[in-house]
Amino acid sequence: MKMKGLWLACCALVLSGAEAMACTGLLVGKKASTDGSVMISYAADSHNLYGEMYHWPAANWPKGATLDVVEWDTGKPLGTIAQVEHTYNVVGNMNEHQLAITESTFGGRRELHNPEGIMDYGSLIYITLQRAKTAREAIKVMTDLVAEYGYYSGGETFSIADKQEAWVMEMIGKGAGRKGAVWVAIRIPDDCISAHANQSRIQQIPFNDKENCIYSPDVVSFAREMGFFKGKDADFSFQQAYCPYDFSALRGCEARVWSFFREYDSTMDQYTDFIKGDASKKPMPLYIKPNRKLSVQDVQKGMRNHYEGTDLDMTKDAGAGSYKVPYRWRPMTFKVDGQEYTN
């Protein structure tokens, strides 16, 4: 879909709980694209998902109207919230003002899941699209909703974009009995590209850059309270505090970001050991300045990436079979003689 300045690719928008960890999102700033548009993408990469295109027509609502919130993944009723007076027209993951929101689930620390929360990540996306016009307004709507009604889901990375700006926001709950969430949102520079793929990506937070960074007031203090962080504010990493790396996070998630980045930055091979599972190595940046501008077709190609041209090329390993097929059946891991392998 191409509309005046924001381009969004969406596919496989119905997620089961097991497949929520199979999403990839790419972001392109307006000065990093060939036509000056902001671009984001969204896909849940699995053979057993079926795509849907949602539509909420614009509407006016009477004073005192309410809205039932149903978990997007499962259809479970979560609660009721106040409705606003007017809601915008939404098709898929974009509204009439060309605000678009997508996500990838990183999960994070299990003890931070709040089973009493009302706002799950899917409802948060689609309700916000009905209520906000810009990316900055969307961030406020989303964070206000979880503060008032509680956050039900695990950790999420959201792509939030309008015709002018692209943002990455990461959010995780506070655990049972504690309403709200801790979160941080960082604007992607106009001349840069970013990506996320089911692993928290925000490291140090530029606390003094109020124009390009927004965060919950307790994002650091809550981590200290929970024993997740003990250092100085300047050394705080959202990822390290709320979603520590493991092998799957690097090999299965950060590797997807790396394979996209390396198409536009010749220095990315310095992170090869990192994405192969060595968490002691320096992590990749949240965004990079590409060596050339990206077109819509480049983003489409990035979403079809199978690590071609790298040691991880999925058409060349044992799982590809005799026909060199890059696709893998779920689950992605299997055990032989007690040893676990990734397919």
List each model region and its residues.
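N-terminal secretory signal peptides that target proteins for export/translocation
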Residues: 1-3
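Sec-dependent N-terminal signal peptides
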Residues: 5-15
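Substrate-recognition/cap regions that form aromatic- and gly/pro-loop-enriched pockets
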Residues: 320-343
